[in-house]
Amino acid sequence: MPSSTSNDDDDDEAKNVSAAAKTHVIFDLDGTLINTEAIVDDVVVSVVTDLLTKKKSSSSSNSNLSDDVQQREIFDAAEDARGQRPLDASMELCAALKLEKRAGVDPKTLLEMCSDTLRWGEEGMDAIPDMPGAMRLLRFLKEKKVPTALATSTSKEELRKKMKNSETGKTMLDYFDAICCGDEVKKGKPDPEIFHLARERLGVKRQDAGRCLVFEDTPHGVSAAKAAGCCCVAVPSLRREKFDMYKGADRVYHSLLDVELEDFGLPKFEDWRDVETVEFVADEGDERISTTTRKHERFLKLEQFLELTGPVIRGFGRGSKMLGIPTANLDVVPLKQQIDKLAPGIYFGFAKLLGPNKSTGVHRTVMSIGYNPFFNDKRKSIEPWLLHTFDEDFYDETLSVLVVAYVRAECNFTTVDNLIERIKKDARVCEEAFDLGLVDGLDEWKDWFVL
């Protein structure tokens, strides 16, 4: 995967990518703009597990894998099949898991079973959330009059159903100058046909395909975009350990919030706020790439502040002991719908305790929401660091956190000392942003600050 560490190869790569300014932008849909991939994966795992379980109960000859390993095998196969048209993905799944032999099911039947479970567009189905930063990016491109297209493996009918359940509904589709669906092409991704179609509908000649910037979340999509001659940004929907599968992309970002359009000759976002009292120094191990020279640390105020409330639970036991930075962890499970609105990364805001320590007041807080790559965590965590010294632990007390701004993506570090230094710098960004009055919109939450 590309690295942000400065060297001649990286400089040459950046120059090559920026050589031809991008004039048009093409988006994938699922996993890039709307968060359907996780929903589909859960359904696939459930359906396939049920099939294998029934087969196992009716036959003495079946996989010797434990249930846990079997589910991980299914989940891996579902992830690897992402980005394709439904039947193509089902064919890959059946082949990878040997389902015709192990469960007596063919690709078409598997697809029908999964579709019956999903039932996009039906009443009562939970809203499909937008990917963090999706609407911000689409609105900005529209405002700057940059032509955009949608190139999705989803069929026209399925697109209609999905957008009915989408958080923003049909509104999102109004931002596109052209829409291309999977049933309009003979071959699906990783074949480049759909990106050729999108380019043509945007009025871009084949020899100018390099002026199109594509946003994709899967290796199949990246392969298709590059085969079409486009420049491709990957915002991976796969787990971090699979990031090597995105080596073909021109850029890899952790989320749409981290995208720096100016690196591609497009207008620069204007909503980041510099904290001029905190110098910017690129972190060792930060995997983001940017050709932009920054002088100061910065933050991005959330379009909507987010409240997270729950009992303080015991975390991994490393905040105080290893880092000297005590965190008050919250349980992810009951807060899943809220944190799905946030990209994994570092945020700041405020926190208050609602139990015996309520009298300590409202405290500024820096928090990690994600997978903490330094410790290679496999499950998501919410780890607020309250910038206040407490006399005692407060496990099981109710903690309310108001998430106000995004600071940066998660990144890995080579040493614990580097990690600690970075966390303390995040705290400085939080303190300085509030001290300098750089965060507006807090008045709308004045009732929250009342204890």
Write out the residue ranges for each language-model feature.
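Asp-based, Mg2+/Mn2+-dependent phosphohydrolase catalytic module
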Residues: 2-8, 12-22, 139, 155-288
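N-terminal helical cap/lid subdomain that shapes the substrate entry/recognition surface
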Residues: 18-144, 157-160
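Solvent-exposed alpha-helix faces
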Residues: 49, 230, 424-428
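A structural signal for short, well-ordered beta-strand elements
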Residues: 82, 103, 127, 152, ...
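Short phosphate-binding/catalytic loops that engage adenosine nucleotides
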Residues: 144-146, 230
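Eukaryotic N-terminal low-complexity, Ser/Thr- and Lys/Arg-rich leader segments
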Residues: 1-23, 27, 55-69, 257, ...
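Phosphate/ribose-recognition catalytic cores of enzymes acting on nucleotide-derived substrates
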Residues: 294-451
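Conserved SAM-binding loop
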Residues: 33, 130, 148, 187, ...
